[in-house]
């Protein structure tokens, strides 16, 4: 099965614009808590994280169909990370036994390794995208180290790295919107008229 992309599908804002803004908003919300601005994650963030994960999944699919592999991997990875974080928060709110922090550290370490590999794979793209993915990996690593060592200053460092990463994601999103929002084409037009396998 193939998917034929035509110009009518590419007249709106690009998937990168929506996906990176979704990442920016979600990472900003969680990083405010990690940076010590708030003492815990509040219900409004818990209510926001699942819809953002779904939007990232949709943007990942659309990016894949437009042969934008880095964006697809970042959006799928972010969506799955947020989905699993929401599932962990729901499980922790239930009557189950609390997991040891060292175990939670492994959760964040695995995601840090994942985004570290994505960062290495992003060397062919723009510097803001590279720095965003690197910042996300370092923020997750700092959270893992906090859970392993019990040193709260590492969480604060990770929180501020996360806030900077959120600003970088917002910059990537805004630059795509500014560069292509008013034109008759978008970054998705680079594959205009080409046939791509859909499976």
Task: Give the role of each language-model region.
Residues 56-89:
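Membrane helical hairpin/interfacial module
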Residues 40-54, 97-111, 132-133, 160-163:
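Structural signature of hydrophobic alpha-helical transmembrane segments
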Residues 22-25, 29, 55-58, 77-81, ...:
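Hydrophobic residues within membrane-embedded alpha-helical segments of Major Facilitator Superfamily
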Residues 31-38, 60, 64, 86-93, ...:
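Transmembrane helix-loop junctions and nearby membrane-interface residues
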Residues 1-59, 63-69, 192-198:
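N-terminal topogenic module of multi-pass integral membrane proteins
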Residues 106-120, 127-148, 154-175:
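Alpha-helical membrane segments in multi-pass integral membrane proteins
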